[in-house]
Amino acid sequence: MSRVLVPCHVKGSVALQVGDVRTSQGRPGVLVIDVTFPSVAPFELQEITFKNYYTAFLSIRVRQYTSAHTPAKWVTCLRDYCLMPDPHSEEGAQEYVSLFKHQMLCDMARISELRLILRQPSPLWLSFTVEELQIYQQGPKSPSVTFPKWLSHPVPCEQPALLREGLPDPSRVSSEVQQMWALTEMIRASHTSARIGRFDVDGCYDLNLLSYT
């Protein structure tokens, strides 16, 4: 299935503080990144790709357009998706990730805004985010191909049987061929291999056929 890159604007991340902000132990454990689509009408999201950078868990909320008279509402479509099996180790910390619409918890149609919620509970990493974020929608469908009627509607199995009625019986043809072969062998066996001389007639020479030099 084809896909088309959707132009978007990724806003700066907003950190939500974990712990006492008045002490050195307070640190951002949650980041919120909003993505808008100022030049695109509400669309059906097909795929999200990005490169992880030490984010342990990802949640996604989408804002879906309903109508001009109803305000768009936020819906959670992905909740605590694991990007690092162990937040305290390097595994998965810098992997490329692709998320498809069939993995989402809700319908991904009429999307007007996207919100990424990043979590990293481990104190080992100084910073975390996602990079190279790209949003895709479904591309135009391929034009339908028209097949000939004889190809799209196969001939029923009964019709070839009717066509065979006009053909000779294979066993009869085989028998006649064998008879012709036997007759040919008989003629070949009875044919003399003696050479006939140019002027030899019944073992004698015909004087009228001889030429004088």
Swiss-Prot record:
The keyword Protein biosynthesis does not apply. It is found in: Nucleus. Its main location: nucleus. Keywords: Microtubule, Nucleus. High expression level is found in brain, testis, liver and kidney. Weak expression in spleen, leukocytes, small intestine and colon. Part of the neuronal tubulin polyglutamylase complex which contains TPGS1, TPGS2, TTLL1, LRRC49 and NICN1. This is Nicolin-1. The lineage of its organism: Eukaryota, Metazoa, Chordata, Craniata, Vertebrata. The gene is NICN1.
